[in-house]
Regions:
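Residue cluster at the C-terminal edge of the helix-turn-helix DNA-binding motif
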Residues: 41, 58-61, 120
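Extreme N-terminal segment that seeds HTH/winged-HTH DNA-binding domains in transcriptional regulators
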Residues: 1-31, 37, 87, 91-123
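A short alpha-helical element within helix-turn-helix/winged-helix DNA-binding domains
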Residues: 31-42, 56
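Short, cationic-aromatic polyanion-contact patches
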Residues: 10, 34, 70-85
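Beta-hairpin "wing" of winged helix-turn-helix
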Residues: 25-26, 30, 58-67, 71-74
Length: 124
């Protein structure tokens, strides 16, 4: 994982975990790597990983079973999706609309491009 200098590492780790949950790589109820395992694999201090896990725990995305480890919480996908939708709509989407207006791009243009994107497969 390559880290962005402009965003705290613990938040980047939390984002990566959320992406794994959203894509189904880590399904709800599954055990995730321990703080130590994650720290070793990412080559970061375990305290940084612990901060990520604490953040995600406080949001109800993961939970700790004492002595066993951390697990993806039931409903985690919905929590993540709702949080990311809100962030997208209040931030990124406003910027997209602003650029569309400046560049003269219509909703119909975007709709057409979106349907082409979906029909080709969104994984490209």
């Amino acid at each position: 994982m390559e880290f962005d200098q402009h965003k705290p590492i613990y938040l980047q780790i939390a984002d990566a975990i959320c992406e794994r949950i959203l894509t189904g790589l880590w399904p709800e109820g599954e055990r995730i790597p321990s703080v130590r395992e994650c720290g070793i694999s990412l080559e970061v201090n375990p305290n940084t990983v612990a901060r990520s896990y604490d953040e995600l725990s406080s949001e109800g995305i993961i939970h700790n079973k004492r002595g066993i480890g951390y697990f993806v919480s039931p409903g985690a996908k919905n929590v993540i999706r709702d949080k990311q939708r809100e962030s997208f709509v209040s931030g990124d989407l406003k910027e997209v609309f602003r650029k569309m207006e400046i560049l003269g791009i219509s909703i119909e243009d975007i709709s057409s491009l979106y349907h082409k994107y979906i029909s080709k497969g969104s994984k490209e």
